[in-house]
A protein has these predicted regions:
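Glycine-rich, often acidic, oxyanion-interacting loops/wings at catalytic, nucleic-acid
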Residues: 131-136
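N-terminal helical cap/lid subdomain that shapes the substrate entry/recognition surface
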Residues: 126-130
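Conserved phosphoryl-transfer catalytic core
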Residues: 97-123
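Amphipathic alpha-helical segments that form well-ordered structural scaffolds
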Residues: 105-112, 139, 174, 178
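Active-site phosphate-binding and catalytic loops of NTP-dependent enzymes
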Residues: 166
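An N-terminally biased module of ancient metal coordination in phosphate/nucleic-acid-related enzymes
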Residues: 1-72, 155-162, 170-216
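Active-site gating loops and adjacent loop-to-helix segments of metal-dependent hydrolytic enzymes
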Residues: 67-94, 98, 119, 138, ...
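Short coil/loop linkers at secondary-structure junctions
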Residues: 31, 116-118, 146, 213
Length: 216
């Protein structure tokens, strides 16, 4: 069985719509595909409907931006039930508010050094009105300040450059516990992105006790 259990759509930082992801999965012969947009379930209804329409097994998911010991960790939730969409939206509401404040501060800090961006213009260009750093990276590229989105992330949008101040995020362990309560599967995504081996060994037993099911 061939599956892709971690994709993103245009509802976060992907380049395909939820329907296009389903069509691509069908084209390349996947047996199942999961949509795990960052901090939103906004694309899941379209995704699941497209799966039924085109005969592709879909897995409703989400990727939460969380925090543990001041490090950002991404927790993927799989097999999200529609009945829990409102709970997840409520969990993310405060996080989205803090994220928007962080994004506005980023644009303001960039402007101080001559990187002029229009935040409202960026926001209006998104599918659901939620801005992430990928949107800001694209705006920097379109303005000619960087040659690519990748360059933006490797330079101006890195915390060490001083423009980006990360927002406060929900606890990793709290999100894992909530996913367990929903009857969903929780997965630690790309574990070595922000943790070394010792930190991972310290985190995993606690995460498992809270209900963590897997790592990527």
């Amino acid at each position: 069985m061939f599956c892709d259990l971690h994709t993103h759509s245009t509802f976060s930082d992907g380049t395909f719509s939820p329907t296009e992801i389903v069509l691509k999965a069908k084209e390349i012969g996947l047996d199942a595909v999961a949509l795990c947009d960052h901090n939103t379930v906004a694309g899941l209804d379209e995704f699941v409907l497209a799966g039924k329409k085109y005969g592709v097994t879909t897995v409703a998911g989400i990727e939460f931006s969380t925090e543990y010991n001041s490090k950002q960790l991404h927790i993927v939730g799989l097999f999200i039930k529609k009945e829990n969409y409102s709970d997840i939206t409520e969990i993310m509401a405060e996080s989205q508010k803090l994220k928007e404040e962080s994004n506005k501060l980023l644009v303001k800090n960039l402007a101080k050094d001559g990187y002029i961006l229009d935040y409202d213009e960026i926001k209006n260009s998104t599918v659901d009105g939620f801005v992430n750093r990928a949107n800001i990276a694209a705006a920097l590229m379109h303005k000619g300040y960087v040659s690519s989105v990748k360059e933006a992330f490797q330079t101006l949008l890195m915390s060490k450059f001083g423009y980006y101040v990360p927002p406060k995020r929900p606890s990793s362990l709290y999100i894992i516990e909530r996913l367990k309560g929903f009857g969903s599967i929780s997965v630690l995504a790309h574990p070595f992105l922000n943790m070394n081996e010792d930190e991972l060994r310290e985190f995993l037993p606690k995460a498992k006790a809270c209900g963590l099911n897997a790592t990527e």
